[in-house]
Amino acid sequence: MLPLNLALTSIALLIALITRPFKAKLETSSPKTILISGGKMTKALQLARSFKQAGHRVILVEAHKYWLTGHRYSWAIDRFYTVPNPDHPDYPQALLSIVQKEKVDVYVPVCSPVASYYDAVVQSILAPHCSVMHVNVETLQRLDDKYTFAAAAESFGLRVPKSYLITDPQQVIDFDFTGTARKFIIKSIPYDSVRRLDLTKLPCETIAETAAFVNALPISKQKPWIMQEYIPGQEYCTHSTVREGHLQLHCCCESSAFQVNYASACQPEIEAWIRTFAKRLNLTGQVSFDFIQADDDSEMYAIECNPRTHSAITMFYNHPHVARAYLEKEALASIVQPLASSRSTYWTYHEIWRLVTDRKSTRLNSSHSTLSRMPSSA
């Protein structure tokens, strides 16, 4: 892939060199210094570009082992630092040192599911020195936990699937499924990259099959699971930036199998749901939600919440007001949403892979069609 990388990078640099002098530089009356983590990720680069285009100074950080990330060389980056992994004891002090040295005004974590916890922990350490666009530990644990998230939403009168906390396989075996209109699925509450895609429907055909299935899962009080209604329908994913309960920036797109393609999909019902949820919890930070519009009743249900940056933020690549959404403490007159002129975003290698596999599939289907038309020998 090196030749392709080199060719694409060279073309992009050439275009940038030609067009850069003609681009209007935005000025701000109050320039800030912004610290962004997760430097190797595309969403971190997108945020860096948005802040830089708005006239702010951008500091990018990443773990030591990713010191050579190409993003450090972006024109949007003023300084680059490496820090220990988020779970390392020295991580909080490393971030604090950068905040103090660079006089950082706002810290915007761009983190993984695991790292989001440590950025919530470090919030209390950084808060006396800068604003932190991340939820606190208590809120993070409440939102990350699929069951407590569903319980909170339901208490606010917001629509979620029927959900049950499971700490012992016997709870599922003894559950009375009679009279339930929908099947159920069971998911690990702690993040499980392997089993998260298992959508086995419960109950199984027999009690014995149900028992065999749930007894094979690592369910315990220490590792609880959630049994939730299975709702077939159109799935949506979102990214929202919230300050003191005000929804400042929001985007929504249809979910896909690999979730590497993003095209804006206007869903006012989802926006209203998130606005209510954010206000009730007085959230500050970045949150992303998964929703599904049910095939059977056409209603919109929130499935889960991930309190961190979503890659759908890339849909704001040409929006001039992203920085305002992150920096303004007061509610904006209108929510920042992808421009009508913005095109869908995608990842080049995935498009190449899809092009190749689609062609293979077409050839196989063509061959199968040809064979099916061939006369059988007598």
Place the predicted regions along the sequence by residue.
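ATP-binding N-terminal substructure of ATP-dependent carboxylate-amine bond-forming enzymes
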Residues: 1-134
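Active-site nucleotide/adenylate-binding loops and adjacent lid/helix of ATP-dependent enzymes
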Residues: 140-225, 243-246, 268-272
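Positively charged, low-complexity/disordered segments
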Residues: 364-377
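Protein kinase-like catalytic core scaffold
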Residues: 184, 248, 299-304, 370
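Flexible, glycine/charged-enriched surface loops at secondary-structure junctions
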Residues: 226, 286-288, 335-341
